[in-house]
Curated annotation (Swiss-Prot):
CDD domains in UniProt: RRF (cd00520)
A GO biological-process term: cytoplasmic translational termination
Record's keyword annotation contains Protein biosynthesis: yes
Organism per entry: Ectopseudomonas mendocina (strain ymp) (Pseudomonas mendocina)
Transmembrane feature ranges: none
Function: Responsible for the release of ribosomes from messenger RNA at the termination of protein biosynthesis. May increase the efficiency of translation by recycling ribosomes from one round of translation to another.
Pfam families attached to this UniProt entry: RRF
Coiled coil: none
Protein name: Ribosome-recycling factor
Length: 185
């Protein structure tokens, strides 16, 4: 019973960490990386499709992404979707190939992205703490129903705190790596 609660909490905290990784990957750095375009949706075949499902995205060089549409008729729609996204990118089309140069980040935009990364990391920490709170509430409920002793509850709460501390440290580490990446010139 206690192990199920801890295991569930650990899984949910792990999902929060995965969400953090996805969110941090979508924050643009000076280098070209296909995940930057994950949020771009392209109107194709009657619905909005993620860009990575309608085109192949590759890194051409450190500052350029190369996009080749699976269907050449979608090239114009892909280019327009990238331009209208809030990423501040300006694609250029050459036949069926679309190149997306990554503009160099100014000091101001670096600081803005760093602030955004800190906000995303703080949201992840809050999510991890909410999972801990839910698990502690379940433990308290079991103790109140006399299904576990107070000692078992306290021991499980201490173990939950250790698990939480580990995940918070992982969040801090991911943020540190992203900040270093953002501030590298």
């Amino acid at each position: 019973m206690i192990n199920d609660i801890k295991k569930d909490a650990q899984e949910r905290m792990g999902k929060s960490l995965e969400a953090l990784d996805r969110n941090l990957a979508s924050i643009r750095t000076g280098r070209a990386h296909p995940s930057i375009l994950d949020s771009v949706k392209v109107p194709a075949w009657g619905s909005d499709m993620p860009l990575n499902q309608v085109a192949a995205i590759t890194v051409e060089d450190a500052r350029t992404l190369k996009i080749v549409a699976h269907d050449k008729n979608l090239s114009a729609a892909i280019e327009k979707a990238i331009m209208t996204s809030d990423l501040g990118l300006n694609p250029s089309s050459a036949g069926t190939t679309i190149r997306v140069p990554m503009p160099a980040l100014t000091e101001e935009t670096r600081k803005g992205y760093t602030k955004q990364a800190r906000g995303v990391a703080e949201d992840a920490k809050v999510a991890v703490r909410n999972v801990r709170r839910d698990a502690l509430a379940e433990l308290k409920k079991l103790a109140k129903a006399k299904e576990i002793s107070e000692d078992e509850e306290r021991r499980a709460a201490d173990e939950l705190q250790k698990i939480t501390d580990k995940f918070i440290a992982d969040v801090d580490k991911a943020l540190e790596v992203k900040e270093a990446d953002l501030m590298a010139v």
